[in-house]
Amino acid sequence: MTITPQHLIALLPLLIVGLTVVVVMLSIAWRRNHFLNATLSVIGLNAALVSLWFVGQAGAMDVTPLMRVDGFAMLYTGLVLLASLATCTFAYPWLEGYNDNQEEFYLLVLIAALGGILLANANHLAALFLGIELISLPLFGLIGYAFRQKRSLEASIKYTILSAAASSFLLFGMALVYAQSGNLSFVALGKSLGDGMLHEPLLLAGFGLMIVGLGFKLSLVPFHLWTPDVYQGAPAPVSTFLATASKIAIFGVVMRLFLYAPVGDSEAVRIVLGVIAFASIIFGNLMALSQTNIKRLLGYSSISHLGYLLVALIALQSGEMSMEAVGVYLAGYLFSSLGAFGVVSLMSSPFRGPDADSLFSYRGLFWHRPILAAVMTVMMLSLAGIPMTLGFIGKFYVLAVGVQASLWWLVAAVVVGSAIGLYYYLRVAVSLYLSAPQQLNRDAPSNWQYSAGGIVVLISALLVLVLGIYPQPLISIVQLATPLM
């Protein structure tokens, strides 16, 4: 297949981020300058975001058999780039106090962003696997970046070993799917499944193994055991990336796979996914109840959020509202998580050893950093799905999709899970307004709102509130991005 100028325009975000990786690498080799390399990374990610406008003008097209660039790919590419940009801005003040190599952090984030963009555009199982590896490998280094901290190193080793095992399951599953169908392309797989091949034991075994591999990457129950330890051990800016960009990119490609290859038509697959969704919602929320560490709490809550999204995925065959529900929910989850982890990053900067992730560190925050406490409150309310926040709109969509598809037991799980979640999110919010301890262990810088990370946190809070009250602009963007069904 010949690559035309139109194809190059469609691949602009991928090419720009790839070029930024090379530029930052050469810059580090030439001269170590933290500010310069952070600026280059942010400029590259912003340029990739702006280039999405030109991609939109070029229209939908297949670029090689591996990738399809369309509205859907643009939406998920945009979300991944926003998460990567936020990670870099949160990391800068954190790295200011870090005495080892600072610049490589941005290099690893850019390579992981490259993997996320590839996943958003993937239209083939080979591209899916390459994207997942490209996003996972830099995370091994990022999670263990504070390697002098025992917990960070332990989290990195744990994630590396389990991720390698999950990748082998995924690859073996793909091999079985290929052995039975003779295809790896999503569209060709869809045609094979349409010919009644879906009930072949080998194909079902292949999809089963793929669910194990992808379930690990998305930290769904029972493949979730790494999640709380890794979220707690990783530096706060890395936990931000882990909770947002990697989950969004992988869930996006799973949506596309289910869209073209209607795996959900198999009753066996639907039951397995339903049980995983139910267990993730209930278990994730129950485990978060007893947490006194904010990063662990957000780790367990991310398990339940992916469970909610899985409900929309199971209902995908019932109509295009599922696509809309996932897009809106992921946007709400992105901004809410960026705000919550952003506050933790600001409180933990500059690097002084362990992060400020104990719930006690946030007790009485309102009395000395009122705006920061207000931002954290908004994020907790949005994650809990309280009306007038973007989180509520996403949860409402998921419930509507579940009702439309008559998935009553999963709808009940969403309602019960949300009720449990309300308790621990409000527990964090209430602690912000209690009387402050006499001596502060950790505190955000006094001028935090003028830093790049502070601005990102404030914008996230504003978007969560504005789009929670008037979600139409976001819904319109998501509808434009889902003309596939």
Swiss-Prot record:
It is an enzyme of class 7 (translocase). Pfam families: Proton_antipo_M (PF00361). Keywords: Cell inner membrane, Cell membrane, Membrane, NAD, Quinone, Translocase, Transmembrane, Transmembrane helix, Transport, Ubiquinone. It comes from the Bacteria. GO terms for molecular function: NADH dehydrogenase (ubiquinone) activity; NADH:ubiquinone reductase (non-electrogenic) activity; quinone binding. InterPro entries: NADH-Q_OxRdtase_suN/2 (IPR010096), ND/Mrp_TM (IPR001750). The chain crosses the membrane at residues 8-28, 35-55, 71-91, 105-125, 127-147, 159-179, 203-223, 235-255, 271-291, 297-317, 326-346, 373-393, 408-430, 455-475. GO terms for biological process: ATP synthesis coupled electron transport. Its EC number is 7.1.1.-. It is found in: Cell inner membrane. It is a multi-pass membrane protein. Its main location: membrane. One of its GO terms (cellular component) is plasma membrane. It catalyses: a quinone + NADH + 5 H(+)(in) = a quinol + NAD(+) + 4 H(+)(out). NDH-1 shuttles electrons from NADH, via FMN and iron-sulfur (Fe-S) centers, to quinones in the respiratory chain. The immediate electron acceptor for the enzyme in this species is believed to be ubiquinone. Couples the redox reaction to proton translocation (for every two electrons transferred, four hydrogen ions are translocated across the cytoplasmic membrane), and thus conserves the redox energy in a proton gradient. NDH-1 is composed of 13 different subunits. Subunits NuoA, H, J, K, L, M, N constitute the membrane sector of the complex. Belongs to the complex I subunit 2 family. HAMAP family: NDH1_NuoN_1 (MF_00445). This is NADH-quinone oxidoreductase subunit N. It comes from Citrobacter koseri (strain ATCC BAA-895 / CDC 4225-83 / SGSC4696). The gene is nuoN.
